[in-house]
Amino acid sequence: MAAAVRVTAARARLRVVVRSLHAGVRSLCTQPVSVNERIENKRQAALLGGGQRRIDSQHKRGKLTARERISLLLDPGSFIESDMFVEHRCADFGMAADKNKFPGDSVVTGRGRINGRLVYVFSQDFTVFGGSLSGAHAQKICKIMDQAMTVGAPVIGLNDSGGARIQEGVESLAGYADIFLRNVSASGVIPQISLIMGPCAGGAVYSPALTDFTFMVKDTSYLFITGPDVVKSVTNEDVTQEELGGARTHTTMSGVAHRAFDNDVDALCNLREFFNYLPLSNQDPAPIRECHDPSDRLVPELDTVVPLESTRAYDMVDIIYSIVDERDFFEIMPNYAKNIIVGFARMNGRTVGIVGNQPKVASGCLDINSSVKGARFVRFCDAFNIPLITFVDVPGFLPGTAQEYGGIIRHGAKLLYAFAEATVPKITVITRKAYGGAYDVMSSKHLCGDTNYAWPTAEIAVMGAKGAVEIIFKGHENVEAAQAEYIEKFANPFPAAVRGFVDDIIQPSSTRARICCDLDVLASKKVQRPWRKHANIPL
């Protein structure tokens, strides 16, 4: 319901923007007399982009223009544009002609606010040379990225570009490299978000890949290094744009994109909501908002949520929703590597990162894709001071030749590395299974977890009872009795609790209250690491 209200309000704002742009176009003077009039004419030309015909064409595709997108993303009246008068510098192939000069070139850049918080933004304008990147276009983007780094504010890129501007040759390629360099320099310093709202091909794809989060719009956005025609000529594969690089491909198969939205308005509204979870920079604490959900709220339904039979599945997402503030959970990559859950929520108003195994998918086993998905998310949270809460129900790593040949050892080590390296507050709740090496990996006490809880249903052991009995009691006459003995000794939380590997065995209903209390205590946590140039994560 709330999302529908936001979309309705956004569409109303959009109508106002379109009317104001059209009014500006009607007032356009073609015979400048003074410098002031010339300035105003240039300004109006910049607002018009590639012209009304191209704007109409953009709308017919179900897409907004670059300026309409900025207007919906930012708070009303907060956008301050920079470099509106910049034009490309190419003189070859007829580009020097006045008809090929557009104030602002093919990107709109500047700063504004989202819910009162500073953000820098660039929005590529497909109505001008298909949004292609020129040297001037890249210069504008680099300038706002430099400014964002200087003041400590996030950068959001609204991508809608045909790629490099061929007429400019190597200058266009140099422009991409300039942007990539800044993406890398800003990584872990300020949040970087890419929203793909049209084509993004060739060299253009690497900037979104270097940012922290990449979102897409269904049916109108595409990400690929080489398009369908090149694929056909090289590999003889017949593939459509949507199949090769559409939103479904990248949110369910490749893992390149983190979420996909129905249309431009839906994407921009969700991006505003997502932005609220993030700090402005690595020097700022995670945002805290007023909370009306009691921090000591008990959740009685959690006492019976885990089935008595250890082989029966349940939905870890239900547990997450019931514990976080007001059941508000922004899941990241919900359709990729579904055996692990990651996303943002709030606990007593404080932003937290959630990681959880999903027993409904592959019994919650860790595999290559889920390990990489989890590791990337954990490292983002650690870089930006966001506490981590981990819900564990993991029977181990997924066995099989496909996983071994694919490098599960190396990829699984990424998740282990991420949790071990993280110095933010780390709270872990073992809901049921925590077997073998996967137990260690999932933010265990041994990886410097700050607070580690177990529910009464927790089973912390090297492996499940059946497999263990087959090894320990091989040839034993009474296998059932042996299995019962193993369960009594190991398939429960007590062995770990006795050794201090879990801090407490808690009633599930008290989980929210315990976590909120722990977060208050851990808010002042500080960890000093030995100096090093950079770590060498097993990429």
Swiss-Prot record:
Main localization of the protein described in the UniProt heading: mitochondrion
Gene: PCCB
Protein purpose: This is one of the 2 subunits of the biotin-dependent propionyl-CoA carboxylase (PCC), a mitochondrial enzyme involved in the catabolism of odd chain fatty acids, branched-chain amino acids isoleucine, threonine, methionine, and valine and other metabolites. Propionyl-CoA carboxylase catalyzes the carboxylation of propionyl-CoA/propanoyl-CoA to D-methylmalonyl-CoA/(S)-methylmalonyl-CoA.
Family the UniProt entry places it in: Belongs to the AccD/PCCB family.
GO MF annotations, alphabetized: ATP binding; propionyl-CoA carboxylase activity
Domain CoA carboxyltransferase C-terminal residue range list: 294-533
Domain CoA carboxyltransferase N-terminal: from-to ranges: 32-290
One GO location term (cellular component): mitochondrial matrix
The organism's place on the tree of life at top rank: Eukaryota
pH-dependence annotation: Optimum pH is 8.0-8.2 for the propionyl-CoA carboxylase activity as measured with the holoenzyme.
Keywords: Acetylation, ATP-binding, Ligase, Mitochondrion, Nucleotide-binding, Phosphoprotein, Transit peptide
One GO BP: short-chain fatty acid catabolic process
Oligomeric form and interacting partners: The holoenzyme is a dodecamer composed of 6 PCCA/alpha subunits and 6 PCCB/beta subunits.
Descriptive protein name: Propionyl-CoA carboxylase beta chain, mitochondrial
